[in-house]
Amino acid sequence: MFGLHNHRGSCWVNAALQGLFSCPVLVDRYSEREEVDKENPVDVCLESIYRNQGTTGLREFFEVIKTTYLPAGENIGDSHELIVHLCDKLSWLDKAFRFETGDRIECGGCKVVQVEKTTAIDVNLVPSRAGIPLLDAIHEYVRPQTISDWKCDKCSHLGCTKQVLFGTFPKVLMFWSTTPIDYSSLLVLNGKKYFLFSVVCFNGGHWWTYARKLPPGHAWYVLDDMNVREMDSKKFPVDRTMRVLLYFLYEN
């Protein structure tokens, strides 16, 4: 665990990277320098930042990721959007995050069912109220919804039920929400165990991260730019300013 300097509001970059650097996928890759794609400047910069604990590579990283919506090194941005952007630029990271999903649509008239398949790298949760347990928020996410203005191509009936389905489960499961959710260190979905390794937070003007190394048993750390502090072993980082939760699949 190491700190990163804040350059003109780059706390959102720091929070995203400090969270990702606890991910086993990144740890394994950057522990073996020969795996780095020398033709990919994003990969090269991340490896430099990781191996040299932030003393090199950060300013170069700003330049290679900078866009109109990712003002790295110039202004505050969004940690979640940066993680999504990194998945777009790094195929191996995208592979770890991406999963198959789809919408099951059933006509309210003729009852014909169709499934529209796609893939995603995150789950955007919009819970019905603040502070509900993560599993309840997921249940709301996959609960069938009535769509009144949908028109059936077969019978022309107006109205259907739509339900989100998961086709596969990724190595890294990312949830994001602007509403506080009561999360836990262990999440079991469809018999699969996921362990929380990072919580990225935002209070309206500043980003920071809680992170731990895996497997479970390692201490949690607060990573706030250059301020890095180990938490008490009996404490769990529950924070109502959470925006991004990163879980890793435990495979026996």
Residue ranges and their predicted role:
Residues 1, 89-98, 134-145:
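Short, intrinsically disordered, charge-biased short linear motifs at domain edges
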Residues 2-5, 9-19, 84, 105-108, ...:
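Conserved, well-structured core segments
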Residues 14, 48, 110-113, 155:
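General secretory precursor processing signal
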Residues 23, 109, 177-179:
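Residues immediately flanking
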